[in-house]
Amino acid sequence: MIDEHPDRLRDAIVVGAGVAGLAAAGPLTAAGADVLVLEARDRIGGRLLGTSVPGGVVDLGATWYWEFEDRISTLVRRHGVATFDQHLAGDTVVEDATMVQRLPGNRLDVPARRYTDGAASVASALAGELPTDCVRMQDPVTSIDFPDPHRAVVSSRSGTHHARHVILALPPSLAVASIDFTPALPESLARLASLTPVWMGDVVKVVATYPTPFWRDQGLAGAAFSHRGPLQEIHDMSGPEGTPAALFGFARATNHDGDITTKIQRQLERLFGPAAADPTDLLVQDWSRDRWTNPPPNGETANRSLMGHPAYQRHFQYGRLHWAATETASQFAGHVEGALVAAERVVSTVQTALAEETEAAPAPSVEGKNT
Protein backbone atom coordinates (compact mmCIF):
# COMPACT_ATOMS: atom_id res chain seq x y z
CA MET A 1 0.00 0.00 0.00
CA ILE A 2 1.34 3.44 -0.98
CA ASP A 3 0.87 6.15 1.62
CA GLU A 4 -1.92 8.41 0.34
CA HIS A 5 -0.68 11.23 2.59
CA PRO A 6 3.14 11.19 2.29
CA ASP A 7 3.50 14.63 3.94
CA ARG A 8 1.32 13.80 6.93
CA LEU A 9 3.12 14.39 10.21
CA ARG A 10 1.83 11.73 12.58
CA ASP A 11 2.19 11.81 16.32
CA ALA A 12 3.79 8.36 16.46
CA ILE A 13 4.83 5.48 14.27
CA VAL A 14 5.03 2.07 15.92
CA VAL A 15 7.34 -0.50 14.37
CA GLY A 16 5.86 -3.95 15.04
CA ALA A 17 2.32 -5.20 15.65
CA GLY A 18 3.01 -7.69 18.41
CA VAL A 19 1.57 -7.24 21.88
CA ALA A 20 3.91 -4.36 22.77
CA GLY A 21 3.20 -2.43 19.59
CA LEU A 22 -0.55 -2.90 19.72
CA ALA A 23 -0.67 -2.13 23.44
CA ALA A 24 1.24 1.10 22.83
CA ALA A 25 -0.90 2.16 19.88
CA GLY A 26 -4.21 1.60 21.68
CA PRO A 27 -3.98 4.17 24.50
CA LEU A 28 -2.30 6.70 22.22
CA THR A 29 -5.08 6.55 19.61
CA ALA A 30 -7.71 6.56 22.35
CA ALA A 31 -6.21 9.83 23.60
CA GLY A 32 -6.51 11.33 20.12
CA ALA A 33 -3.00 10.77 18.80
CA ASP A 34 -2.43 10.07 15.11
CA VAL A 35 -0.65 6.70 15.12
CA LEU A 36 0.50 4.33 12.38
CA VAL A 37 1.65 0.77 13.10
CA LEU A 38 3.98 -0.83 10.54
CA GLU A 39 4.24 -4.62 10.66
CA ALA A 40 6.60 -6.70 8.51
CA ARG A 41 4.57 -9.91 8.71
CA ASP A 42 1.25 -10.67 7.05
CA ARG A 43 -0.39 -10.96 10.48
CA ILE A 44 -0.47 -9.27 13.86
CA GLY A 45 0.70 -10.86 17.10
CA GLY A 46 4.45 -11.32 16.65
CA ARG A 47 5.46 -14.25 18.83
CA LEU A 48 1.82 -14.91 19.69
CA LEU A 49 1.07 -17.45 16.99
CA GLY A 50 -1.70 -20.02 16.99
CA THR A 51 -2.86 -22.54 14.45
CA SER A 52 -6.21 -24.25 14.13
CA VAL A 53 -6.43 -28.01 14.58
CA PRO A 54 -9.49 -30.24 14.92
CA GLY A 55 -11.17 -29.23 18.16
CA GLY A 56 -9.54 -25.85 18.69
CA VAL A 57 -6.31 -23.87 18.54
CA VAL A 58 -2.76 -24.70 19.64
CA ASP A 59 -0.01 -22.18 20.31
CA LEU A 60 3.27 -22.21 18.43
CA GLY A 61 4.53 -19.19 20.34
CA ALA A 62 3.71 -17.79 23.78
CA THR A 63 1.46 -20.12 25.76
CA TRP A 64 0.98 -19.15 29.40
CA TYR A 65 0.42 -16.28 31.73
CA TRP A 66 0.33 -16.25 35.51
CA GLU A 67 -2.26 -14.65 37.76
CA PHE A 68 0.38 -12.59 39.58
CA GLU A 69 0.96 -10.79 36.25
CA ASP A 70 -1.47 -7.95 36.78
CA ARG A 71 -1.55 -6.32 33.35
CA ILE A 72 -2.31 -9.39 31.26
CA SER A 73 -4.76 -10.63 33.88
CA THR A 74 -6.61 -7.31 33.69
CA LEU A 75 -6.49 -7.27 29.90
CA VAL A 76 -8.08 -10.69 29.45
CA ARG A 77 -10.83 -9.82 31.92
CA ARG A 78 -11.53 -6.45 30.30
CA HIS A 79 -11.77 -7.91 26.81
CA GLY A 80 -13.48 -11.15 27.76
CA VAL A 81 -10.62 -13.28 26.42
CA ALA A 82 -11.47 -16.86 27.38
CA THR A 83 -8.85 -18.61 29.53
CA PHE A 84 -8.48 -21.81 31.54
CA ASP A 85 -6.08 -23.50 33.95
CA GLN A 86 -3.02 -25.37 32.71
CA HIS A 87 -3.47 -29.10 33.35
CA LEU A 88 -1.22 -30.17 36.23
CA ALA A 89 -2.44 -33.51 37.58
CA GLY A 90 -0.29 -36.61 37.12
CA ASP A 91 3.27 -37.86 37.24
CA THR A 92 6.40 -36.62 35.49
CA VAL A 93 8.59 -38.50 33.02
CA VAL A 94 12.36 -37.96 33.15
CA GLU A 95 14.83 -39.15 30.52
CA ASP A 96 18.60 -39.28 30.71
CA ALA A 97 21.04 -40.70 28.19
CA THR A 98 20.25 -44.34 29.04
CA MET A 99 16.80 -44.66 30.62
CA VAL A 100 13.32 -43.25 31.16
CA GLN A 101 11.89 -42.90 34.66
CA ARG A 102 8.49 -42.02 36.03
CA LEU A 103 8.51 -39.75 39.07
CA PRO A 104 5.49 -39.17 41.28
CA GLY A 105 3.74 -35.83 40.90
CA ASN A 106 4.21 -33.02 38.44
CA ARG A 107 7.82 -31.88 38.88
CA LEU A 108 7.76 -29.42 35.99
CA ASP A 109 4.60 -27.36 35.77
CA VAL A 110 3.32 -24.65 38.10
CA PRO A 111 -0.19 -23.19 38.21
CA ALA A 112 -0.69 -21.06 35.11
CA ARG A 113 -3.43 -19.87 32.79
CA ARG A 114 -3.87 -20.60 29.09
CA TYR A 115 -5.86 -18.90 26.34
CA THR A 116 -8.82 -20.96 25.13
CA ASP A 117 -8.60 -19.61 21.58
CA GLY A 118 -4.82 -19.30 21.58
CA ALA A 119 -2.54 -16.52 22.75
CA ALA A 120 -3.11 -14.63 19.51
CA SER A 121 -6.59 -13.83 20.84
CA VAL A 122 -4.83 -11.27 23.05
CA ALA A 123 -3.40 -9.54 19.98
CA SER A 124 -6.81 -9.62 18.31
CA ALA A 125 -8.37 -7.99 21.36
CA LEU A 126 -5.78 -5.20 21.34
CA ALA A 127 -6.10 -4.66 17.59
CA GLY A 128 -9.86 -4.39 17.99
CA GLU A 129 -9.33 -1.12 19.87
CA LEU A 130 -7.53 0.52 16.94
CA PRO A 131 -8.89 2.41 13.93
CA THR A 132 -9.26 0.16 10.91
CA ASP A 133 -6.50 1.90 8.94
CA CYS A 134 -4.03 2.09 11.83
CA VAL A 135 -2.07 -1.13 11.14
CA ARG A 136 -0.28 -1.88 7.88
CA MET A 137 0.99 -5.40 7.38
CA GLN A 138 3.70 -6.71 5.04
CA ASP A 139 5.31 -3.30 5.44
CA PRO A 140 8.80 -3.75 6.93
CA VAL A 141 10.71 -0.68 8.02
CA THR A 142 14.15 -0.28 6.45
CA SER A 143 15.41 3.06 7.78
CA ILE A 144 14.64 5.74 10.34
CA ASP A 145 16.12 9.19 9.87
CA PHE A 146 16.04 12.04 12.38
CA PRO A 147 16.89 15.04 10.17
CA ASP A 148 16.30 17.54 12.95
CA PRO A 149 15.21 17.53 16.62
CA HIS A 150 11.52 17.74 15.74
CA ARG A 151 10.62 14.70 13.66
CA ALA A 152 11.52 11.30 12.28
CA VAL A 153 11.37 10.08 8.71
CA VAL A 154 10.54 6.38 8.52
CA SER A 155 11.04 4.46 5.29
CA SER A 156 9.14 1.22 4.75
CA ARG A 157 7.99 -0.90 1.86
CA SER A 158 4.95 1.34 1.38
CA GLY A 159 6.92 4.58 1.24
CA THR A 160 8.10 7.39 3.48
CA HIS A 161 6.29 8.38 6.66
CA HIS A 162 6.83 11.30 9.03
CA ALA A 163 6.21 11.30 12.76
CA ARG A 164 7.03 13.16 15.94
CA HIS A 165 7.92 9.92 17.74
CA VAL A 166 8.94 6.38 16.78
CA ILE A 167 8.27 3.37 19.00
CA LEU A 168 10.39 0.28 18.35
CA ALA A 169 8.19 -2.67 19.31
CA LEU A 170 10.47 -5.39 17.97
CA PRO A 171 13.43 -7.20 19.54
CA PRO A 172 16.34 -4.77 19.95
CA SER A 173 18.83 -7.01 18.16
CA LEU A 174 16.45 -7.31 15.21
CA ALA A 175 15.97 -3.54 15.15
CA VAL A 176 19.67 -2.74 14.89
CA ALA A 177 20.27 -5.55 12.39
CA SER A 178 17.44 -4.67 10.00
CA ILE A 179 16.96 -0.89 10.27
CA ASP A 180 19.40 1.85 9.28
CA PHE A 181 19.42 4.77 11.72
CA THR A 182 20.53 8.30 10.84
CA PRO A 183 22.19 9.71 12.85
CA ALA A 184 23.65 6.40 13.96
CA LEU A 185 22.59 5.15 17.37
CA PRO A 186 25.13 5.70 20.14
CA GLU A 187 27.71 2.94 19.86
CA SER A 188 27.03 1.68 23.38
CA LEU A 189 23.29 1.44 22.67
CA ALA A 190 23.77 -0.35 19.36
CA ARG A 191 26.05 -2.87 21.03
CA LEU A 192 23.63 -3.35 23.91
CA ALA A 193 20.84 -4.05 21.45
CA SER A 194 22.90 -6.47 19.38
CA LEU A 195 23.79 -8.49 22.51
CA THR A 196 20.28 -8.56 23.99
CA PRO A 197 18.79 -12.01 23.32
CA VAL A 198 15.51 -12.44 21.50
CA TRP A 199 13.03 -14.22 23.74
CA MET A 200 12.36 -17.59 22.05
CA GLY A 201 14.85 -16.60 19.37
CA ASP A 202 16.95 -19.74 19.88
CA VAL A 203 13.99 -22.07 20.37
CA VAL A 204 12.17 -24.64 18.26
CA LYS A 205 8.65 -25.22 19.55
CA VAL A 206 6.91 -28.47 18.66
CA VAL A 207 3.24 -29.37 19.12
CA ALA A 208 1.95 -32.94 18.70
CA THR A 209 -1.83 -33.44 18.58
CA TYR A 210 -3.71 -36.69 19.26
CA PRO A 211 -7.30 -37.95 19.21
CA THR A 212 -7.36 -38.03 23.03
CA PRO A 213 -5.06 -37.05 25.92
CA PHE A 214 -4.20 -40.70 26.50
CA TRP A 215 -1.36 -39.89 28.91
CA ARG A 216 -3.87 -38.60 31.43
CA ASP A 217 -5.55 -42.03 31.47
CA GLN A 218 -2.13 -43.43 32.43
CA GLY A 219 -1.84 -41.02 35.35
CA LEU A 220 0.73 -38.83 33.59
CA ALA A 221 0.69 -35.04 33.59
CA GLY A 222 2.15 -34.76 30.10
CA ALA A 223 5.21 -33.18 31.72
CA ALA A 224 8.67 -34.48 30.87
CA PHE A 225 12.35 -33.56 31.19
CA SER A 226 14.87 -34.99 28.77
CA HIS A 227 18.66 -34.86 28.71
CA ARG A 228 18.64 -36.83 25.47
CA GLY A 229 16.34 -34.75 23.30
CA PRO A 230 15.69 -33.38 20.88
CA LEU A 231 12.95 -31.89 23.10
CA GLN A 232 14.35 -30.79 26.45
CA GLU A 233 11.03 -30.27 28.18
CA ILE A 234 7.47 -31.25 27.35
CA HIS A 235 4.10 -30.08 28.66
CA ASP A 236 0.42 -30.85 28.21
CA MET A 237 -1.06 -28.41 25.69
CA SER A 238 -4.55 -29.84 25.58
CA GLY A 239 -7.44 -27.42 25.50
CA PRO A 240 -10.29 -27.16 27.98
CA GLU A 241 -11.64 -30.59 28.93
CA GLY A 242 -8.74 -32.14 27.01
CA THR A 243 -9.81 -30.96 23.55
CA PRO A 244 -7.83 -30.60 21.39
CA ALA A 245 -5.46 -33.16 22.89
CA ALA A 246 -1.85 -32.10 22.52
CA LEU A 247 1.66 -32.19 23.93
CA PHE A 248 4.23 -29.51 23.26
CA GLY A 249 7.94 -29.18 23.83
CA PHE A 250 10.99 -27.02 23.31
CA ALA A 251 14.27 -27.83 21.60
CA ARG A 252 17.29 -25.59 21.28
CA ALA A 253 17.73 -24.52 17.68
CA THR A 254 21.48 -25.06 17.97
CA ASN A 255 20.94 -28.72 18.87
CA HIS A 256 19.47 -29.82 15.57
CA ASP A 257 20.03 -29.51 11.87
CA GLY A 258 17.32 -30.06 9.30
CA ASP A 259 14.16 -32.11 9.79
CA ILE A 260 13.79 -33.38 13.37
CA THR A 261 10.24 -34.73 13.14
CA THR A 262 11.28 -38.39 13.08
CA LYS A 263 13.53 -37.91 16.11
CA ILE A 264 10.71 -36.17 17.96
CA GLN A 265 8.25 -38.97 17.23
CA ARG A 266 10.74 -41.53 18.54
CA GLN A 267 11.31 -39.45 21.65
CA LEU A 268 7.59 -39.07 22.34
CA GLU A 269 7.21 -42.84 22.02
CA ARG A 270 10.06 -43.42 24.49
CA LEU A 271 8.50 -41.06 27.01
CA PHE A 272 4.77 -41.70 26.64
CA GLY A 273 4.50 -45.10 24.97
CA PRO A 274 3.34 -46.43 21.58
CA ALA A 275 0.25 -44.20 21.47
CA ALA A 276 2.51 -41.15 21.21
CA ALA A 277 4.43 -42.43 18.18
CA ASP A 278 1.93 -41.36 15.54
CA PRO A 279 0.46 -37.92 16.31
CA THR A 280 -2.42 -36.60 14.23
CA ASP A 281 -0.39 -33.45 13.58
CA LEU A 282 3.23 -32.64 14.34
CA LEU A 283 3.76 -28.90 14.09
CA VAL A 284 7.25 -27.40 14.22
CA GLN A 285 7.94 -23.68 14.64
CA ASP A 286 11.62 -22.77 14.48
CA TRP A 287 11.74 -19.23 15.83
CA SER A 288 15.47 -19.01 15.21
CA ARG A 289 14.80 -19.04 11.46
CA ASP A 290 11.94 -16.55 11.52
CA ARG A 291 13.41 -13.48 9.82
CA TRP A 292 11.00 -11.09 11.53
CA THR A 293 11.82 -12.47 14.98
CA ASN A 294 15.49 -13.36 15.07
CA PRO A 295 18.32 -11.60 13.20
CA PRO A 296 21.13 -13.55 11.52
CA PRO A 297 23.90 -14.64 13.91
CA ASN A 298 26.43 -11.88 14.57
CA GLY A 299 29.15 -14.11 15.97
CA GLU A 300 28.68 -12.91 19.53
CA THR A 301 27.00 -14.52 22.53
CA ALA A 302 23.80 -12.87 23.69
CA ASN A 303 23.55 -11.97 27.37
CA ARG A 304 20.21 -12.55 29.02
CA SER A 305 21.07 -10.17 31.86
CA LEU A 306 20.79 -7.30 29.35
CA MET A 307 17.04 -7.76 29.04
CA GLY A 308 15.32 -4.82 30.72
CA HIS A 309 18.58 -2.83 30.77
CA PRO A 310 18.21 0.73 32.17
CA ALA A 311 19.15 2.18 28.78
CA TYR A 312 15.94 0.78 27.30
CA GLN A 313 13.94 2.82 29.80
CA ARG A 314 15.29 6.01 28.19
CA HIS A 315 14.55 7.69 24.88
CA PHE A 316 17.07 8.58 22.17
CA GLN A 317 17.52 10.60 18.97
CA TYR A 318 16.37 13.95 20.34
CA GLY A 319 13.96 12.15 22.66
CA ARG A 320 11.95 10.77 19.74
CA LEU A 321 12.99 7.12 19.64
CA HIS A 322 11.52 4.74 22.22
CA TRP A 323 12.02 1.02 23.00
CA ALA A 324 8.93 -1.08 23.67
CA ALA A 325 9.65 -4.79 23.02
CA THR A 326 9.22 -7.29 25.83
CA GLU A 327 13.02 -7.67 25.96
CA THR A 328 13.22 -4.03 27.11
CA ALA A 329 10.77 -4.33 30.01
CA SER A 330 12.02 -3.56 33.50
CA GLN A 331 9.81 -6.39 34.82
CA PHE A 332 8.72 -9.71 33.30
CA ALA A 333 11.01 -9.29 30.29
CA GLY A 334 10.25 -11.99 27.75
CA HIS A 335 6.66 -12.52 28.90
CA VAL A 336 3.46 -11.08 27.46
CA GLU A 337 3.31 -9.18 30.74
CA GLY A 338 6.71 -7.71 29.91
CA ALA A 339 5.42 -6.46 26.56
CA LEU A 340 2.60 -4.71 28.39
CA VAL A 341 5.02 -3.24 30.94
CA ALA A 342 7.18 -1.81 28.15
CA ALA A 343 4.17 -0.47 26.25
CA GLU A 344 2.81 1.20 29.38
CA ARG A 345 6.12 2.97 29.94
CA VAL A 346 6.36 4.21 26.36
CA VAL A 347 2.76 5.41 26.28
CA SER A 348 3.38 7.53 29.35
CA THR A 349 6.59 8.99 27.89
CA VAL A 350 5.10 9.77 24.48
CA GLN A 351 1.88 11.23 25.87
CA THR A 352 3.86 13.55 28.12
CA ALA A 353 6.08 14.63 25.23
CA LEU A 354 3.12 15.25 22.91
CA ALA A 355 1.41 17.36 25.56
CA GLU A 356 4.54 19.45 26.03
CA GLU A 357 4.92 19.87 22.27
CA THR A 358 1.32 21.02 21.97
CA GLU A 359 1.93 23.71 24.56
CA ALA A 360 5.14 24.81 22.83
CA ALA A 361 5.60 26.32 19.38
CA PRO A 362 4.23 24.28 16.43
CA ALA A 363 6.51 21.62 14.99
CA PRO A 364 8.14 22.37 11.63
CA SER A 365 6.71 21.15 8.37
CA VAL A 366 8.00 17.92 6.89
CA GLU A 367 10.30 19.99 4.67
CA GLY A 368 12.23 20.76 7.86
CA LYS A 369 11.77 24.55 7.89
CA ASN A 370 12.07 26.06 11.32
CA THR A 371 9.16 28.03 12.73
State the predicted function of each range.
Residues 29-54:
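Glycine-rich FAD pyrophosphate-binding loop
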Residues 137-152:
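A conserved short coil-to-beta-strand element within the FAD-binding core of flavoproteins
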Residues 72-93, 213-222, 277:
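A short alpha-helix-loop-beta-strand transition element characteristic
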Residues 168-188:
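Flavin (primarily FAD) binding-site architecture
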